[in-house]
Amino acid sequence: MVSVKASAAEKKEFLQSQIDEIEKWWSEPRWKDTKRIYSAYEIAKRRGSVKPNTFPSTVMSQKLFKILGEHAKNGTVSKTFGALDPVQVTQMSKYLDTIYVSGWQCSSTASTSNEPGPDLADYPMDTVPNKVEHLFKAQQFHDRKQWERICDGTIEESEIIDYLTPIVADGDAGHGGLTAVFKLTKMFIERGAAGIHIEDQTSTNKKCGHMAGRCVIPVQEHINRLITCRMAADVLGSDLILVARTDSEAATLLSSTADSRDHYFILGASNPAVKGKPLNDLLNKAILDGATIDDLQTIEKEWLAKADVKLFHEVFADAAKAAGKDQSVIDQFNSKVNPLSETSIYEMQALAKELLGTELFFDWDLPRGREGLYRYQGGTQCSVMRARAFAPYADLCWMESNYPDYEQAKEFAEGVTAKFPGKWMAYNLSPSFNWTKAMSVDEQETFIQRLGDLGYIWQFITLAGLHTSGLAIEQFSKNFAKLGMKAYAQDIQKKELDNGIDMVKHQKWSGAEYIDGLLRLAQGGLAATAAMGQGVTEDQFK
């Protein structure tokens, strides 16, 4: 550190040392595919006069990067699922190399307001960071407990578990503007997250990725979020893994038309008969006149049909056919205007006028919904366009989808890697999908690796912790009500013993021996109140 009362020369020397250190850090292979729009100086001067400590989460981020790199190199997959609590984390660590923390699960089971609800990201913004801290502290505790045994030589090599499994957490849509994104990222780093994902939905209208009514923000607005996440990590000296998620595949709304990259996908009224007659004006008047919900739905449906709401390239195709033009004119237009061309509405109108000799009627303001949002028609190619824009600012790209569709996943992967070869990708193996209907049992077994072959190196079941917990408790409760202690003794305890589950000795699992050791150390080697002394019932399991 440097004293703020130090000489100007000393402060300048400290600042330069920070700049040099940051530039050296950014020159590491870890950052070869990461784009930053700011200099090391801009970060150094915002770190304060005390050099940042190395957060434990930074070590975990480095570990996660190495894990993902090995999977990418070997053509394998890091697969995991959403953990609810320390019990699940300690058992998962035996078999999986990453842990996921789901916003959905937190929304229903762990909100810091203690008010459960669906996944609308309307819980306090520290909810998911709190859960990360809960799990990470448990990981650290179980690691300390085990390390003591390793040092004492009282544990077999085959028993050793790597409890420090990197955690990737759900950052939702950032919980507000860029300052909120910065603070949220900071919280995640301080509380133990090795990585986070952040999505391109609006924070005010955020929905679960498998709900209707999803509204995305302009491309550049989400890029700004990603830049802010990385900036926060840089200020803290963190190697945070950043996953860019797009919900545009099934998005039906857009918050703003500010970014021309979105223009291809925005729906507009194509019938001049509705010119000067916005849908919202009609709805507002109907409300004042006492219209019911059913009335409003009918008015909206009839207006949309009359307005003939379409994408601009569809309007052009209709106009070309009406003017007697052949398919070559439409093909000429589509060769310059397509999902990945990033053509603005002004360029589309100019090209249409050049090819048809007239400007086409197209108004995307007229059909705006009650919240003032624009109508949007996403899709896989829309997701490709967005992922390509996000890729330079994130370590992995992820398209949220409505079905476990291999061909769609392939289209997305090929679209992204065509521009960014070798780009790492993530896939949500969502329990919202009906897997039994989606594919055969054999296909279920190979699905993860088939996606892995496409570049999806990190895959996760968001809510498996929730569902397995619910299933286990439902079944045990039913059997316990009917069979009494036989249900516990035979279905739980005996299976724990038969399978060598460490939790059967729950006192030892909870660290009672470790804490006894601390007590003895503090009291010169003796502790009459040791929890694991003579009389502990766990001796029955020897």
Curated annotation (Swiss-Prot):
Main localization category: other
Recorded GO MF terms: isocitrate lyase activity; metal ion binding; methylisocitrate lyase activity
Catalysed reactions, as listed in the record: D-threo-isocitrate = glyoxylate + succinate; (2S,3R)-3-hydroxybutane-1,2,3-tricarboxylate = pyruvate + succinate
Pathway: Carbohydrate metabolism; glyoxylate cycle; (S)-malate from isocitrate: step 1/2
GO biological process: glyoxylate cycle; tricarboxylic acid cycle
Enzyme class: lyase
Listed GO CC annotations: glyoxysome
Active-site residue list: 208 (proton acceptor)
Cofactor dependency: Mg(2+)
Subunit composition and interactions: Homotetramer.
Protein name: Isocitrate lyase
